[in-house]
């Protein structure tokens, strides 16, 4: 919330509020893009899938491979052209604006439909992220799911409305560094715990990346296909703009 107040006074134009005036540091922008993408699903959803499902570990590994490829090609193919053409196409500061200006639409149909699609599907996506945060707070602090959900919604909404794009990117930066540290530290603790437990090591040894019963070639293709989502996620594409 304090970050929101800090950047509230630094936003002087509509472009500053919505897109940070296109002047965000490259490290802040890139880490923000990855942190906003690798949100609750990376630290809670994907490990949970790997733990609960029979072929979950194999599924999670192939999904991670697909997402890594999707992230790489999204930055390689989309990032620079999108930044360039959003400026050329009427200095567009939102995805709906860019689509309308890029294709020289005389009506607002393209803008309205793209905005509606983003609103509908991102409401579902955002709700799942709030649910993940609420579950985490409830588990760590024991305050109950509903109070944790309300707290998450209030805090995120407050700094977003106050500071706009800059506040979101800087909070994403801190969260991204925290997530990166967790990804490094947690496996180290897991390894330390597993060294004295042969049962878990034997179970890990059963994980295979090949075609197996319950997880065939179609499952592998479906898992890798998750990476295709990167090319159309507006919260990531906005960072490129």
Positions of PLM-derived features:
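Helix-boundary and loop/linker segments of multi-pass membrane transporters
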Residues: 18-23, 100-108, 142, 208-214
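Membrane-interface helix-loop-helix modules in multi-pass membrane proteins
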Residues: 18-91, 215-230, 236-241
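Hydrophobic alpha-helical segments of secondary membrane carriers
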Residues: 20-21, 31-34, 114-120, 171
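Membrane-interface "cap" regions at the ends of multi-pass membrane proteins
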Residues: 1-45, 160-163, 176, 182-188
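Short, hydrophobic/aromatic alpha-helical segments in well-folded domains
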Residues: 46, 136, 153-154, 164, ...
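Helix-loop-helix module between adjacent transmembrane segments
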Residues: 62-160, 222-229, 238
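Hydrophobic alpha-helical segments and their helix-loop junctions in multi-pass secondary transporters
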Residues: 2-11, 79, 126-130, 134, ...
């Amino acid at each position: 919330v304090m970050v929101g107040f800090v950047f509230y006074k630094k936003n002087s134009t509509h472009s500053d509020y919505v897109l940070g005036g296109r002047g965000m540091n490259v490290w802040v922008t890139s880490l923000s893009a990855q942190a906003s993408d690798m949100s609750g699903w990376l630290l809670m959803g994907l490990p949970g899938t790997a733990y609960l499902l029979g072929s979950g570990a194999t599924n999670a590994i192939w999904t991670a491979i697909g997402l890594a490829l999707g992230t790489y090609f999204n930055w390689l193919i989309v990032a620079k052209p999108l930044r360039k053409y959003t400026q050329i196409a009427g200095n567009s500061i939102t995805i709906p604006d860019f689509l309308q200006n890029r294709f020289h639409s005389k009506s607002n149909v393209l803008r309205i439909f793209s905005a509606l699609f983003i609103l509908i599907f991102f409401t579902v996506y955002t709700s799942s992220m709030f649910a993940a945060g609420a579950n985490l707070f409830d588990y760590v602090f024991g305050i109950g799911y509903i109070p944790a959900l309300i707290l998450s919604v209030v805090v995120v909404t407050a700094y977003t409305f106050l500071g706009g794009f800059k506040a979101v990117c800087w909070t994403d930066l801190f969260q991204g560094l925290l997530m990166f540290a967790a990804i490094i530290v947690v496996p180290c603790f897991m390894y330390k715990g597993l060294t004295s437990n042969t049962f878990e090591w034997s179970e890990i040894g059963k994980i295979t990346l090949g075609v197996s019963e319950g997880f065939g070639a179609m499952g592998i293709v479906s898992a890798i296909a998750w990476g295709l989502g990167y090319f159309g996620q507006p919260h990531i594409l906005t960072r490129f703009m």
